[in-house]
């Protein structure tokens, strides 16, 4: 299947860095991707009527479909309708929340190239309208998760654009962000941090 960006450029999945989860055997949830862990967490929040948060679908425009059999359809070509914004959005305690989820195998920093300008602009707009915007960053080698408010991401992005470093150090994330506690259910309890950072 061929997928194209809105500008017509071809999306080549093979050239994208493939994130293979690191398999660890110390407890059962290690090795899950951040997306799987957050989807599991959000399902827990929804089931227990804590919050309503969902993964945003990626909008695609189907262009070419083959029908090898009457009951089967194979998409051969599709385009991204528009650049995606962030990964998740929803409502918690009457407030709109919107966040991006990112993973890195780096030990000491998080590269800002993992963000796109339209994602930064989207987070700015959410904050301007009194929504809550943040990023959850997973350091896969340590199995550590941090919640970092959008204002810090925006500041680090601006620093990069004025000749500063092109990454956020792990020390800066530890200083400005909040370490998330992990467990079985919910896997990544980011709501507890939201209560502390935004609702206290």
Swiss-Prot record:
Binding-site positions, Mg(2+): 85, 87, 100, 119
Cofactors (names): Mg(2+)
Cofactor remark from the record: Binds 1 Mg(2+) ion per subunit.
Gene Ontology CC annotation, any one: cytoplasm
Ranges for region Disordered: 1-24
Top-rank taxon, per record: Bacteria
Reactions listed under catalytic activity: Endonucleolytic cleavage at a junction such as a reciprocal single-stranded crossover between two homologous DNA duplexes (Holliday junction)
SUPFAM superfamilies assigned: Restriction endonuclease-like
UniProt EC number: 3.1.21.10
Keywords: Cytoplasm, DNA damage, DNA recombination, DNA repair, Endonuclease, Hydrolase, Magnesium, Metal-binding, Nuclease
Subcellular location: Cytoplasm
Family that this chain belongs to: Belongs to the RecU family.
Name under which the protein is recorded: Holliday junction resolvase RecU
Organism: Bacillus mycoides (strain KBAB4)
High-level lineage: Bacteria, Bacillati, Bacillota, Bacilli, Bacillales
The encoding gene: recU
